């Protein structure tokens, strides 16, 4: 597998609408304010998190069960700054909508700005022909409240090209998270 360059990413956006909206260069300042960067980088794309968050809470004394997930585990917030409680977790989503080509696997890594503050972002790989908004999982590993800034960079996506086309893509097997919009909760 080879990692794809900024040149390839631009071409895939133009020819296959791979990322919408697409920002062709790194943005580090907005209205004269420093922000957490987003946009195209040398070998990846730094995506933004929207202002839509679901924050884990224990006010309803429920159990987190991935096979029978309860929305009572979460508090919905539409905010410019999401505050994640200590040692807790929040879900967000990318502003960008992705359409992954059939010969590409996309891996997500966190931003060092957040990682150095004890905030970890996790996303499972975006499989060939998957499309949708990416649900982002943010973990606050610190004993203090932590901030996530909406409309700023949250993670970086790396595009890996296979030397061979897959037999069955995510679309072929009708994956349960296909064409998701908004923050998508666990499905079984």
UniProtKB/Swiss-Prot annotation:
Kindly indicate whether the keyword Hydrolase belongs to this entry: yes
Please name the GO terms of the biological process aspect recorded for this protein, alphabetically.
dUMP biosynthetic process; dUTP biosynthetic process
Record keywords, A-Z: Hydrolase, Nucleotide metabolism, Nucleotide-binding
Reported EC number(s) for this entry are: 3.5.4.13
Report the Pfam families cross-referenced here: DCD
What is the enzyme's main class? hydrolase
- Give the pathway: Pyrimidine metabolism; dUMP biosynthesis; dUMP from dCTP (dUTP route): step 1/2
Instruction: Give the InterPro entries listed for this entry.
Output: dCTP_deaminase, dUTPase-like_sf, dUTPase_trimeric
Q: List the disulfide bonds.
A: none
Recorded coiled-coil stretches: none
Binding residue positions for dCTP: 111-116, 135-137, 156, 170, 179-180
Give this protein's Gene Ontology molecular function annotations.
dCTP deaminase activity; nucleotide binding
Active-site feature positions: 137 (proton donor/acceptor)
Report the domain of life of the source organism: Bacteria
Reaction(s) catalysed by this chain's protein: dCTP + H2O + H(+) = dUTP + NH4(+)
- Oligomer status and interactors: Homotrimer.
The Swiss-Prot or TrEMBL record describes its family as follows: Belongs to the dCTP deaminase family.
Q: What's the stated role of this polypeptide? A: Catalyzes the deamination of dCTP to dUTP.
Q: What is this protein called?
A: dCTP deaminase
Q: Which organism is it from?
A: Rickettsia canadensis (strain McKiel)
What are the leading ranks of the lineage?
Answer: Bacteria, Pseudomonadati, Pseudomonadota, Alphaproteobacteria, Rickettsiales
Q: Which gene encodes it?
A: dcd
